Structures are given as structure tokens and as C-alpha cells.
């Protein structure tokens, strides 16, 4: 060594040139019970991604940290832990729950980890963001004061949606939920569409993309698919990723339509995770974490800071056995800004979209439309409900014309109202045209149709699509007398629901 060499300079030089790798921390797999893996000897935060390596490095499984107790980590694997042996090595792969986001995702179909499902290369996104997002101060959110044209006249005119609103689409199975979702996806005037297909059948992913979206719709969309056969933690991760992508484009000033199908499957995934790590079951077996997760997800949608962009969210909610008192339906109603309920009775009579006005509501409609439109929509809903309440009496001819003038009007307008609520799934209806049509219907009555007031000779078909049929038989006079007598015997005036 040169005696003139400064020792401290030499140390500094060596410390910059020699890079010592950080020591890698390992743990050991000690127990596997059902969906849960338990590891000791490793400290990792919740949400961290770990890699479990079996003997001879031949079997590797990724898992997410979902809980811990004392010195034990609880992990949930992304895939079946087949081939993983006792004492397998557990190491941290990604300590933070982060995801790569960017405009490169547009037009792509990806999984819960951002990997492509469409056969193309992995999107090269440069923005690394926390998966659970960053909460917005409620005082900094902009108001919901702009109409969002969804192209479905029943919703545009009677359940008007605003940019940044959160809506629930509540339906049982087989009542046209997917068809209405497709209409909303294609017809809504939004800059970006983010679709999370969570926990549904795998075959529906390709069908939804090809039939409901199409090439033109996919070009401005991002689809995140997590079918029912994958791990519950991946289904939850896909849900978080869907919200994060929507938040990214919202913060870029875009008006985003986000559709999550379905919120019920998200709750099921959280139930699987919660019960597996020992949470106590509550209503319908759901652990408390479910009732915390859903409002947190829903609050991520809405108008951005100071009105900069918006996320209009549509969450489908499965009403099992058409039970609208299900706990998930209840919490969705409490957390959302309105709901659109689909009725099996309407679907069975080929009435599409099968929107049940009696249970559906938009809580911000009165802030979006003028007073006249709001009053017209209210009258339409009132007449629709009044007819349904008295439908049995009308069907059997027990209602006496003139007993209730408003019900007479409901019967007269019923065919036109039924026709107005139906719409071809390939034909959009502009917002202004929808409003104009409903005003004409209520103010002027049905066009090209003889006004009919309820009388005992009118018999409504069981399907609401049909017009009332007037019977003009030679015995109509005697029929009139006998029916009127029957109506009197029934004391219709007292039985009528007003």
C-alpha cells in the first residue's frame, strides 16, 4: 500500500464500489389448514406478497399475508398449494400492495395481478400506486351536478344518474342483468369504462367482451377478470385494482364509468378469507370485515377533488332467491346513491329492461333535472304504482270506473307506459329525447290510441306488454249490468287501494 494513501479515502471508495446485497429474510411453513397457510420466523405487513418455495425449488406458490397472531403469519395462496411440503421456505416477494397503472391499459383484458388475459404482451405501465388507493377528504369532493346520459330511457327519465353517482343494480338470476349491463357499457357517454368481472362464470368474460362491448367499446375500456374458480384473495385484489384504475383516470380529469359485477361475489370472497383466519360469522355467515370492506370500496368512487374528473360506479348486487332483504343488499342500499331493481315478473313477461320502478330510486335526481321533469317523473311512478296495487281488482273486473279518477288515468295510460319502459338492447335513447317523450306521454296521453277508461268489459292480458282488449259481444249490455252488480256486491269503493 502506498504510504501516502489516505485510509479514510480508501474506505469511502470501497464502500461506493462494493455493493452488499440486503440480507434476505426467510420464514418456515409450519401448518396448512383449508385455505390458510401458517408461517413462522418471518415478519411481513398485511397485504404483502410472499413466495413459498418447496423442496429443490421445484414448487413455488405466491400467497398474500391476510393476518397474523403472535409470531405466526396467516397467508392465503393465489393458486392451489400442491406440492408444498412442511418446512417449505417462505420469503417476501413484494412488501407493499402496489400495482402498475397507466394509459397503456386501455383496450386490454387483465387479471388481478395486471397480467394480460388477451394474449398480448404485458402492459408497460410506469405509475406504481398503492392498491387500496388514497382517500379523498369529503370536503374536497366536487358536487354531483351533471347528468350522465346512459342511453337507457327508463333510467334517463325516471332514475336520472349524475356523473360521480354510485348506483346498485339489484337483481336475481336470469332477469336481464347482463343485458342491461351491456346496454349501459355501450350507451353511456363516458370517457373511460372500467369493468371488473369478479367471481362470475369464466365463460361470461369472453361473451361479455365480444357481445356487450365489441371492438369499439373495448378501445376505451379496461377489463379486469377474476372468475369464480380463482383464489378469494385474487378476487379481492381484482376488485381493488378495478377501483385503482378508475381512480387513476379520474385524477387525469376523465369521466369514468366503473362497473363491478358483482358486489355480492366480492362479499363472498371476503367471507371466505375472514372465516378462514378465524373471524366470527354474523348475518348469513358474513364476518364483520365484509361490512367494513364494502363501504370502503364504494367510497372510492364519486367525484374527484374539486370536481376534477369523476367515477360513476354501477355495482351489481345479487338478490339470492329474489330476496331484497339480504344483508349485502341492505348494506348496498345504505351506502349507495340509489338502486335499480330488476323484477322477475317483468322479465317473465318479456319486458326488458325489467326495471321495477317501485323499488328503484336515484337519490340525486332532484338535483340534476328541472322541477317540471321531476314532477312528471313522480307522476309517472305514482300512476305505475297505483295500477300495480289495484291490478287484481282490475283483472277480475271488480273495479268500477270513476271510483278513483287517478286510477282511471293510470289504466288509460298503462299500455303507453309499458311501451315507454321497454327498449331494444341495441338502440340507445338520448337523454333529451327520453325527457321529451315522458313529458308528452304524461301531458298529452298516449298517441294514436283511443283513450279508454276502465270498465267491466276491458280485460287486461296477464302479460303487461299487451294492450287492453275491449269485448264487443251482443251480450255486452247484459255483461255490463252483471259486472256492475258484482262490483257493487264486492263493495269495491271500500276495497280500492288509493
Q: What is each model feature region?
A:
Residues 16-17, 58-62, 97-101, 116-121, ...:
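Active-site phosphate-binding and catalytic loops of NTP-dependent enzymes
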Residues 157-158, 164-472, 489-498:
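P-loop NTPase catalytic core
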Residues 25, 46, 105, 125-127, ...:
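A generic structural signal for well-ordered coil/turn residues at beta-strand boundaries
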Residues 90, 104, 117-165, 179-183, ...:
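P-loop NTPase nucleotide-binding/switch module
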Residues 10-17, 91, 150-155, 242, ...:
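Phosphate-interacting basic helix/loop segments used at nucleotide- and nucleic-acid interfaces
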Residues 466-484:
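Long, intrinsically disordered, low-complexity tracts enriched in Ser/Thr with interspersed Pro
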Residues 1-108, 113-117:
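N-terminal accessory targeting/assembly segments
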